């Protein structure tokens, strides 16, 4: 095989050592907190029928138009590597006839064909939270509180801002769209090519544009709050009141719309200034019409996703493994004995390494880490039923009888 083909595919990354430990820590902590909030875990395949996403994300969304990994399998079915979790979780809800209300936690890799940059890969990882079955502001408040709680336990709140917006009900959205179209039509020729197309297909999506030519025009866009119906205004006020009651600080940002068609009403992002353009660490909102649009019952829902790579880049995590034991057998009989000893110690929860052969003591000790505990034994030790125990951290070495070995190791590890 060509050497070039042994590298990582562009936009993907191997995880080893501390990077992998950080990912595992973020997942464990998130799942633990999700359990406290009444969530149950669900796992979905990384492949879905393409229609699961095209019917829900919006035909003109960046994900559907530019970023999905699509292929036909050998039976001719159109298949997609999942670009996000929510649509797949809704499929599970409908397919398994889950009883609502229900809270679902999921995690794993997702795939989007994007230009790789800091904290933005083509394969990346998310932890995902979905709450199906409540149309009350309290559900929105609790989901935001869950995101805040996780970031708090990750010790990230010092540089995190909760930004929140309210897109409103259908009445609000329809009124605002008309005003937005009227405003943007004045600058149609100056908009990016994508935004000119979206002005016809989905003008709200323009608010999420990152194109420099669009950002300047959007500075003076009409404020959506002026178009709230009474029910929208009351709902948003209750959400903000609930956040105040929980002492969760926030900033109302009416430019947040989220990039997917299924969002409505409350939308929010937890952002940081430490990651450049990829500043959203947690993002989500309400998607009351999604389940029905996929063929299920009319089910209100709210949820969010957290980017694991982005959180990993921010946290200060020190991984500490229990100390390991290294066996140094000297002589043929000692090698045979080492096999049985290693198995016994591992069955008692102790990490054991050895190189499966008769060792030269001096050379073997040079290769042992400073934090390890070394067990040395040869013909003399086997005859006397003893073992030499050397603590590499302190340099102390002692001979102990075999029956005391487990107690001795447990005191040192």
From Swiss-Prot:
Broad EC category: ligase
Query: GO molecular function of the protein, one example?
Result: histidine-tRNA ligase activity
Question: Which cell locations does it reside in?
Answer: Cytoplasm
Q: Which domain of life is it from?
A: Bacteria
**Cytoplasm is among the record's keywords:** yes
Print the keywords alphabetically. Answer: Aminoacyl-tRNA synthetase, ATP-binding, Cytoplasm, Ligase, Nucleotide-binding, Protein biosynthesis
The record's section on PANTHER family has: HISTIDINE--TRNA LIGASE, MITOCHONDRIAL-RELATED, HISTIDYL-TRNA SYNTHETASE
What protein name applies here? Histidine--tRNA ligase
Protein source organism: Ehrlichia chaffeensis (strain ATCC CRL-10679 / Arkansas)
| Origin organism lineage | Bacteria, Pseudomonadati, Pseudomonadota, Alphaproteobacteria, Rickettsiales
């Amino acid at each position: 095989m060509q050497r070039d083909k042994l590298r990582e595919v562009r936009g993907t990354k191997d995880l080893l050592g501390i990077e992998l430990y950080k990912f595992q820590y973020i997942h464990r902590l998130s799942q633990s907190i999700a359990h406290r909030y009444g969530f149950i875990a669900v796992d979905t395949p990384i492949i879905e029928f393409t229609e699961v996403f095209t019917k829900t994300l919006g035909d003109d969304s960046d994900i559907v138009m530019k970023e999905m990994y699509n292929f036909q399998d050998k039976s001719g079915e159109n298949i997609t590597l999942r670009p996000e979790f929510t649509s797949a979780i809704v499929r599970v809800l409908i397919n398994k006839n889950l009883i609502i209300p229900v809270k679902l936690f999921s995690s794993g890799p997702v795939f989007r064909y994007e230009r790789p940059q800091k904290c933005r890969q083509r394969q990346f990882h998310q932890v995902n939270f979905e709450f199906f079955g409540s149309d009350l502001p309290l559900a929105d408040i609790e989901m935001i509180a869950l995101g805040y709680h996780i970031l708090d336990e990750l010790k990230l709140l010092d540089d995190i801002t909760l930004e929140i917006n309210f897109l409103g009900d259908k009445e609000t959205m329809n009124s605002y769209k008309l005003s937005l179209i009227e405003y943007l039509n004045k600058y149609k020729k100056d908009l990016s090519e994508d935004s000119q197309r979206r002005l016809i297909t989905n003008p709200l999506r323009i608010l999420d544009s990152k194109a420099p030519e669009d950002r300047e025009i959007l500075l003076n866009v009409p404020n959506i709050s002026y178009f709230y119906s009474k029910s929208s205004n009351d709902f948003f006020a209750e959400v903000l009141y609930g956040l105040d009651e929980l002492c969760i600080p926030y900033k109302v940002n009416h430019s947040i719309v989220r990039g997917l068609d299924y969002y409505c009403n409350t939308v929010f992002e937890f952002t940081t200034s430490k990651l450049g353009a990829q500043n959203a660490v947690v993002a989500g909102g309400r998607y009351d019409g999604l389940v029905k649009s996929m063929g299920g019952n009319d089910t209100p829902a709210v949820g969010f996703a957290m980017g694991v790579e982005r959180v990993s880049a921010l946290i200060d995590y020190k991984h500490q493994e229990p100390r390991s034991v290294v066996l140094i057998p000297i002589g043929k009989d000692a090698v045979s004995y080492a096999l049985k000893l290693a198995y016994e110690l591992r069955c008692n929860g102790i990490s054991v390494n050895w190189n499966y052969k008769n060792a030269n003591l001096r050379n073997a000790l040079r290769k042992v880490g400073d934090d390890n505990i070394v067990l040395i034994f040869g013909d003399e030790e086997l005859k006397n039923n003893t073992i030499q125990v050397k603590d590499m951290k302190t340099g102390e070495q002692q001979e102990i009888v075999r029956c005391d070995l487990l107690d001795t190791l447990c005191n040192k590890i």
